UniProtKB/Swiss-Prot annotation:
GO terms for biological process: pentose-phosphate shunt, non-oxidative branch. It catalyses: aldehydo-D-ribose 5-phosphate = D-ribulose 5-phosphate. This is Ribose-5-phosphate isomerase A. GO terms for molecular function: ribose-5-phosphate isomerase activity. It is an enzyme of class 5 (isomerase). Keywords: Isomerase. Gene3D superfamilies: 3.30.70.260, 3.40.50.1360. Pfam families: Rib_5-P_isom_A. Pathway: Carbohydrate degradation; pentose phosphate pathway; D-ribose 5-phosphate from D-ribulose 5-phosphate (non-oxidative stage): step 1/1. Belongs to the ribose 5-phosphate isomerase family. Substrate binds at T26, G27, S28, T29, D82, G83, A84, D85, K95, G96, G97, G98, K122. Homodimer.
Length: 224
């Protein structure tokens, strides 16, 4: 599995050229992309500016010598590469397993091009096998949790290693929704967007046109 992740990370790095502002995703697969960019910066004198999507990715990029800027310090991002937790047949996706969904969606929104890198296990006909993360303001979050229970979304709190409620980089909580099959991802996204106290959710609908997939038969690119 790790070899598949590394393959797509290296493949995605081929789309990066000197002079680009590059969005650096978060997660185990995106980490291989960042690692390959670091190698190219050191060995090929690749000149880029990275915009990170989490404190974890910032630390990795700094250690690799990749120059960084905030999303607010650049005019736009040329290309963002990130992983995904689940992708349906229309290239809608669920992200946020690494608790970085808010920063990931902000960087993706201001990117000219956006690519996901995954192994084939992340592909499915419909979304729903992976939990939908919802980042929420801490104040009033128990009330939101009850709302999700009433909607039969089987909510659970995202916890840290100590068993306490995880706090995101932006100082929010995450409530994970467990919905067996999401027939209409956009309808669910619209519903969540209207809920007071919801900061962002992990439904990334109609945001990517290209997915790089690694599988038993090698690396392939799915475009839409």
């Amino acid at each position: 599995m790790e070899n598949l992740k590394k393959q797509v990370g290296i493949k995605a790095a081929e789309f990066v050229k000197s002079g680009m502002v590059v969005g650096l995703g978060t997660g185990s697969t995106a980490a291989y992309f960042v690692e390959e960019l670091g190698r190219r910066v050191a060995e090929e004198q690749l000149e880029i500016t990275g915009v990170t999507t989490s404190s974890v990715t910032s630390e990795q990029a700094k250690a690799l010598g990749i120059p960084l800027a905030s999303i607010d310090e650049v005019d736009y991002v040329d290309l963002t590469v990130d992983g995904a937790d689940e992708i349906d047949s229309h290239l809608n996706g669920i992200k946020g397993g690494g608790a970085a969904l808010l920063m990931e969606k902000i960087v993706a929104t201001y990117s000219k091009d956006y690519i996901w890198i995954v192994d084939e296990s992340k592909l499915s006909e419909n979304l729903g096998s992976f939990k939908v993360p919802v980042e929420v303001i801490r104040y009033g979050s128990e009330q939101l949790f009850k709302e999700f229970e009433r909607a039969a979304y089987a909510p659970t709190w995202r916890l840290n290693e100590e068993g306490e409620k995880l706090i995101t980089d932006m100082q929010h909580f995450i409530i994970d929704l467990h919905i067996a099959k999401i027939e209409n991802p956009q309808k669910l996204a619209d519903e969540l967007d209207l809920m007071v106290g919801v900061v962002e959710h992990g439904l990334f609908n109609d945001m990517v046109k290209k997915v790089i997939v690694a599988g038993s038969d090698g690396v392939k690119i799915i475009s839409q």
